Amino acid sequence: MNNKDWTGNAKSIFVCNGASNHTEEERQENDYYATEPKAVELLLQKEKFSSHVWECACGGGHMSKVLAEQGYIVKSSDIIDRGLAGTAIIDFLKVTKEDILNDIQRDIITNPPYKIAREFVEHALEISMKNTKIAMFLKLTFLEGKARKKLFEKYPPKVVYVSSRLQCAKNGDFEKYGKGVGTAVAYAWFVWRKGYKGDTVVKWIN
């Protein structure tokens, strides 16, 4: 295979969040596959967010820590506590518009659970206030399908940043897979601005 983006090995197909190679038994409870911090660093080189951001599927805090290091005031939440100090236990899909209105205006940056990624995206867009920026780290194949087409017609992403192969790790254990190990799954940052109705721009993030 001649693919300049491929830097992995035979283990790589088992690394990433939601890869089709995972069996149900292999998946962590609540679909926990942590995102390589580099993915957030690359996003922040391209996009600016409001000073207050919400990582609403924070897991062990791999994204939250990078955001905080970059000067953002981060609200970190998840459906269960995975050890990040200060994590708020929140079922994101049960958050209402009223909850948002009664809170600080925050942009959203997260890698949602694979099995309910579409629900996460739709819910974030439905409850957010106008001009809220929402960035979701998703499989590139999120672009496919009739249901997604309807979503994109209603809420077109402003930008999709396609990534060369980045690493995600089961249970947040990046050391298990070795430095430089890639993944068989292509990912992208999908960035929405609530209220945007123009065409989607596709860019390459690295």
PLM regions and their residue ranges:
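Class I S-adenosyl-L-methionine-dependent methyltransferase catalytic core
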Residues: 1-206
